[in-house]
């Protein structure tokens, strides 16, 4: 793997974009359930998914092709949801099937969506 300032920067920005996506997902969810949009509340809801995201990045070595929809985006998305839900189950937080479905759909749109847009822009550029 070639490491250069450009590839390191791209990976860092991609990881940051993924973090922002998780925070957007959590904020939308908290708002739709009339829960407070506080730093503490968002952090409490987000941390299992952020842990899943980080683990998925490490397990799948997402920094190698951080902007690719496949396989990176798909594996990061699936890992984020699976690990995040596993952590939530482990701490006694909700993992109702409807929540798993909504979380899966919304995070897919966000985590795969920004990558698809980036790929399209890169092809045009």
Model-predicted regions and their roles:
Residues 9, 13, 108-125:
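Membrane-water interface at the C-terminal end of transmembrane alpha helices
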Residues 39-51:
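Structural signature of hydrophobic alpha-helical transmembrane segments
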Residues 86-102:
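Membrane-helix boundary connector in multi-pass membrane proteins
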Residues 35-39, 66-67, 92-97:
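Membrane-interface helix caps and helix-loop-helix hairpins in membrane proteins
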Residues 60-79, 97-104:
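Internal alpha-helical transmembrane segments of multi-pass membrane proteins
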Residues 6-41:
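Membrane-helix boundary elements
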Residues 21-32, 55-63, 83-87, 91, ...:
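Alpha-helical membrane-inserting segments
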Residues 21-23, 48, 75-87, 106-107:
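Small-residue-rich segments of transmembrane alpha-helices in multi-pass membrane proteins
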């Amino acid at each position: 793997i070639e490491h250069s300032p450009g590839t390191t920067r791209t990976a860092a920005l991609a990881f940051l974009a993924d973090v922002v996506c998780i925070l957007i997902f959590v904020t939308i969810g908290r708002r739709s359930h009339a829960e407070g949009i506080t730093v503490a509340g968002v952090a409490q809801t987000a941390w299992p998914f952020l842990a899943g995201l980080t683990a998925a990045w490490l397990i799948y070595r997402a920094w190698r092709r951080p902007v690719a929809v496949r396989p990176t985006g798909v594996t990061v998305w699936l890992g984020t949801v699976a690990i995040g839900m596993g952590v939530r189950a482990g701490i006694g937080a909700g993992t109702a099937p409807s929540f798993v479905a909504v979380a899966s759909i919304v995070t897919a749109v966000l985590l795969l969506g920004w990558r698809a847009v980036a790929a399209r822009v890169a092809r045009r550029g």
